[in-house]
Amino acid sequence: MREIRISKLVLNIAVAESGDRLQKAAKVLEQLTSQVPVYGRARFTVRSFAIRRNEKISCYVTVRGEKAYDLVKRGLAVKEFELIRKNFSDTGNFGFGIQEHIDLGLKYDPSTGIYGMDFYVCLERRGYRVARRRKQKAHVGVKHKVTKEDAIKWFQQEFDGVVLNKAPAS
């Protein structure tokens, strides 16, 4: 009952501009997940970056279930199963980024280019549905919530991962 599992995985590619590059980034996500990505919009105008409010600047996709577990494993293999302590949040989630999408096993296409992406992994225990259901919503108890230490321990057991205290000097 208290085992931790992946609730969802969100893959995000932030291009910071709309147009052709954003469409190609969405195509990369679609090839990777076989799902249609959603576009993220700018919250406010930033003149120095030539971004207008409500302009599409990123694309992301939410993956659940066994497919999410497989994608997390492939992403962590790129990072050599090493994360730093700052990658884990207090609520038991963690995230990391990769520089090139071709490291995940996709073929390089010169017309598409190379995109980096962010992985955000949400962890939960069984019983979290009580907070999301429509009728008789309830709070998840403090002892049942996933903490930062629980998430780190799960990562080390599940993937034989290494958690470093600081980022390695590169």
Swiss-Prot record:
Component of the large ribosomal subunit. GO terms for biological process: translation. It comes from Chlamydomonas reinhardtii. This is Large ribosomal subunit protein uL5. GO terms for molecular function: rRNA binding; structural constituent of ribosome. Its main location: nucleus. SUPFAM superfamilies: RL5-like. It comes from the Eukaryota. Keywords: Cytoplasm, Nucleus, Ribonucleoprotein, Ribosomal protein, RNA-binding, rRNA-binding. Belongs to the universal ribosomal protein uL5 family. One of its GO terms (cellular component) is nucleus. It is found in: Nucleus; Cytoplasm.
